[in-house]
């Protein structure tokens, strides 16, 4: 087999693995397949709660009363809106994180079905008008008194915002039976968390949002919600998107996932058996970023005194996380010098190429030496074409005598695959790349594909006209041609097809990939072209000497 065929096959193998990787990523992660959890940790709903399962199937939508008022609360990081009907949080905007329309991202909002992202159901108590009272700048109470079945209750919801600009809200529930000599008479209440986090741009497209999912962290494992799954005493349960999430932590909680109106909801079930009840929920509502999540693992790092909550486990870590950490560090160093994440990706690419340059140089030299052996190789192939075993033996003997490694030219190509996959995960999980502009007006966000025109509908499975995939395809073709040691005219039909076919296949596979990933690929191609010219000149000078 000729050296160029080996290299082309290595590239083809790389293409195959990239395609498989993209498909697996889309199937396993973007869709959050429920098969992730094979062994479920269950509790018996009837035994533990002594209630009718049919109660879980009730309609949890609520209509805001005409007498309801909106209460707006502002902190340095949040703009929150509460409704006095139900005392629910109906909108929560992140002031420091803007969407593509340059407006605060709304992480909690009312849905057309009159559902908030999370709310509490307590029979008639949940559908009452509450009185609002501001305790201080960070603590806000909603109170109501109501009669249920001849019994009178005082119901208080207390929302406490962080004084240290942490993305956490403490929700306290107080339920007091005014008839002190009587039991509460309510068996349980539910905290409902639905799949409602979205970011919409003016174009009407979901942004930064390659999945909407429920997750639960239990027994040191991250698991994904599915209909019918119930777990006792998890660390937290949450709903999230690519870059934002809402996580709920509570002591001794029991969680059930159930489809309601084709939407997966998580129900935190809480049994009541006292005359007076108080409960506490800690609700993280903010970026899916360890910078903000991990402070709740040590009580001295957060104003709520929380520890070992493990919110940071919601950020998935791939098998190549050990590569992503130094890559992220290198990007951060370059960004500190030149505050542009697009340039940081380009510099990271150059660093990677420099690190593997010794292998690349040896690879190219091995390919050149193999090209010189073509006459001898063809002679052996003709001589022993009817004896495959002897043919392989003679080829191996020739390689040993000439000191040539026949697969040496493949190593740099295959070595780049882990780097590519690691960067793919980094671009999808590195929060600072969200909304990071490289070239304003063209590449406005490195975490999504570039776009010069939005159709508003799908055209051949595409919604946008993008430029970077075309640049990638052209530079990939040039890189392949320059890396070859033979003239294009001498190539066979199959090799010509591989030369042109693979860049085109890469074009289709990577068309909708984040622009940060394509910048890495394009920079790699351009660097490879320049590098190959340098190597050829260097080898030419050595021959002349």
Curated annotation (Swiss-Prot):
One of its GO terms (cellular component) is plasma membrane. Interacts with the Sec translocase complex via SecD. Specifically interacts with transmembrane segments of nascent integral membrane proteins during membrane integration. This is Membrane protein insertase YidC. The keyword Transferase does not apply. Pfam families: 60KD_IMP, YidC_periplas. InterPro entries: Membr_insert_YidC (IPR019998), Membr_insert_YidC_N (IPR028053), YidC/ALB3/OXA1/COX18 (IPR001708), YidC/Oxa/ALB_C (IPR028055), YidC_ALB_C (IPR047196), YidC_periplasmic_sf (IPR038221). Its main location: membrane. It is a multi-pass membrane protein. Belongs to the OXA1/ALB3/YidC family. Type 1 subfamily. GO terms for biological process: protein insertion into membrane; protein transport. It comes from the Bacteria. Required for the insertion and/or proper folding and/or complex formation of integral membrane proteins into the membrane. Involved in integration of membrane proteins that insert both dependently and independently of the Sec translocase complex, as well as at least some lipoproteins. Aids folding of multispanning membrane proteins. It is found in: Cell inner membrane. Keywords: Cell inner membrane, Cell membrane, Chaperone, Membrane, Protein transport, Transmembrane, Transmembrane helix, Transport. The chain crosses the membrane at residues 10-30, 319-339, 341-361, 407-427, 467-487, 502-522. The keyword Nucleotide-binding does not apply.
